[in-house]
Design a protein with these regions (language model features):
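Arg/Lys-rich, positively charged N-terminal/basic patches that mediate binding to nucleic acids
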Residues: 1-27
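Residue-level recognition of oxygen-bearing side chains
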Residues: 8, 36, 78
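Enriched for short, Lys/Arg-rich terminal
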Residues: 2-4, 22, 52-56, 60-88
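Short aromatic/hydrophobic contact patches that present stacked aromatics
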Residues: 10, 47-49, 58
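Residues that form generic nucleotide/phosphate-binding pockets
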Residues: 12, 27-30, 82, 86
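A short, surface-exposed loop/turn module that caps and links secondary-structure elements
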Residues: 27-51
Length: 88
């Protein structure tokens, strides 16, 4: 599947240090092989999350388009606020 990202995700990764980027890259590599490996987000169709020590990676699987859309990489509280704002 092809990986795409939102502008929110792009802003989130700019804030990361080297260790954070390496950790995120490992998660994205796993997701690209098995896109539905994360925890399904309640009330959001085909949206999944994977938790790290301090943040959560949120992505949407668009099966028909063959796309994994990386939505955000934020702490827990920010994730839920941003999901409400995005209205997925």
């Amino acid at each position: 599947m092809e990986l795409e990202s939102t502008s929110v995700f792009d802003k989130d990764i700019k804030k990361l240090d080297r260790h954070g980027r390496k950790e995120l890259k490992g998660m994205i590599d796993k997701i690209s092989v098995q896109p539905e490996m994360g925890k399904p987000m309640e009330h959001y169709s085909n949206v999944f999350s994977k938790r790290t020590e301090h943040r959560r990676l949120i992505w949407k699987v668009k099966k028909q388009e063959g796309v994994i859309l990386l939505l955000m990489y934020k702490n827990r509280d920010e994730v839920y606020e941003e999901l409400k704002r995005l209205k997925l």
